[in-house]
């Protein structure tokens, strides 16, 4: 058991690679959780100049939260409250969302958004960071170490389910943004 992150351990898991990947994520999370308060302070400090540079982002997240949030009994799409949450998630998972302006620029123009894929059993534990387009297309899926691991395979049916739900929530303006985003992605 690693700081309460792993409930049971099977000596012979059916998918050894997925079990290994999940264990590594849990170990990293447990290690980072010890330093969580310090990391939160770092995230606030790191986010401050980004918030100043991209003031629309916080407002955009307030306006899209209900449209893109979704969960079932196993997984959840959780939207950040704003830039500080994205920075903290990037720090905890060790990927690039807090080290580049690219994502905040895309968010501020409604080209794409950063959302979090979590396990419903612990929506506070970072698992995957997704970059999504306004129509629900997933551009990127990244976990610990800026990687995409085999444990994501089990969540793919959920992501397709989420995309169907989101498609039903879109209005005309969202569809126009989705078309523009698709064009920008292919350029």
What spans do the regions from the language model cover?
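Glycine-focused motif/segment detector
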Residues: 1-187
């Amino acid at each position: 058991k690693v700081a309460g992150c792993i409930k049971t351990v099977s000596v012979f898991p059916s998918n050894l690679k997925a079990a290994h990947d999940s264990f590594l994520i849990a170990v990293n999370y447990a290690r980072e959780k010890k330093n969580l308060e310090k990391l939160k302070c770092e995230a606030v400090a790191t986010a401050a100049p980004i918030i100043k540079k991209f003031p629309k982002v916080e407002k955009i997240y307030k306006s899209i939260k209900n449209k893109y949030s979704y969960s079932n009994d196993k997984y959840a799409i959780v939207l950040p409250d704003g830039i500080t949450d994205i920075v903290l998630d990037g720090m905890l998972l060790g990927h690039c969302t807090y080290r580049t302006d690219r994502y905040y620029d895309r968010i501020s123009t409604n080209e794409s958004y950063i959302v979090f894929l979590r396990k419903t059993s612990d929506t506070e534990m970072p698992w995957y960071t997704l970059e999504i387009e306004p129509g629900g297309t997933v551009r990127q899926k990244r976990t610990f170490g800026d990687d995409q691991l085999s444990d994501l395979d089990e969540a793919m049916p959920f992501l397709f389910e989420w995309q169907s739900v989101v498609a039903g929530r879109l209005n005309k303006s969202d569809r126009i943004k989705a078309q523009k985003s698709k064009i920008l992605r292919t350029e």
